[in-house]
Amino acid sequence: FAIQGEGSEAVVYVLEVNPRASRTVPFVSKATGQPLAKIAARCMAGQKLAAQTGIGGRAPLEVVPPYFSIKEAVFPFNKFPGVDPILGPEMRSTGEVMGVGLSFGEAMLKSQLGAGSRLPAKGTVVITVKNADKARAVKVASDLVDLGFSVVATKGTAAAIAAAGVPVGVVNKVKDGRPHIADMVKAGEIQLVYTTVDETRQAIADSRYIRTAALANRVTYYTTMAGAEAATEALKHAEGIEVQSLQALHAELEEGLAATPAA
């Protein structure tokens, strides 16, 4: 709530009521073609859904699109050399983009392109993850090898990957001597970085060099396993994507909804 008033006898005015979905609702509306904010506002004003027939001459219906939509944040880190791009609870994004595709991987790839991240079609990926993520890292490494990428990892991560029978090279952390990850990134030998760390101040400080080296050399990086897994799915579509218009997708949805019998 945003409230304004002065003095003990002041009239208090409620200037704003924010439902904390101010950016998610427009995204879902754009993904489905449904004016959710308008529908919700009319419900709050007392108008039942059945009476809201302004959309295609029918009452609002649940929409389950046959495609995927992904919202991705845009960050300004490349404008601030030397800053650690690891994310925390504070707001750091300066905008958002949306990727739409017939598969999750295609939508993910489009969202990354829109946000300014370039995913390689070939090359070497470095993986260094915390212990809790090693099992998931094995699957990611296996998928990368199947896609034709070379995989290198720090000692502990490499051991977990190798134990699963996935080919992997070993690269040093900075504290273990040269050549280390930052050296390979600066030399152009790494095209993609997957790195996760324990959420402790020391672990974050120790791994800062990986993130800053990737940022300084414009190497795309991911700092969560969810991000790494999604990016790996996107790499499966790196050879080409199909451009689609939201208008055409929404029209197809409307055709399907028009054929849906009333409840």
Predicted segments — roles?
Residues 31, 35, 39, 92, ...:
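Conserved active-site and cofactor/substrate-binding residues in soluble primary-metabolism enzymes
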Residues 120-192, 196-204:
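Conserved structured catalytic cores and adjacent interaction surfaces
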Residues 1-121:
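ATP-dependent carboxylate activation and anion-phosphoryl transfer catalytic cores
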Residues 56, 77-79, 84, 88-95, ...:
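Catalytic domains of riboflavin
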Residues 31, 112-115, 139-146, 167, ...:
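Short, solvent-exposed amphipathic alpha-helical segments in soluble enzyme
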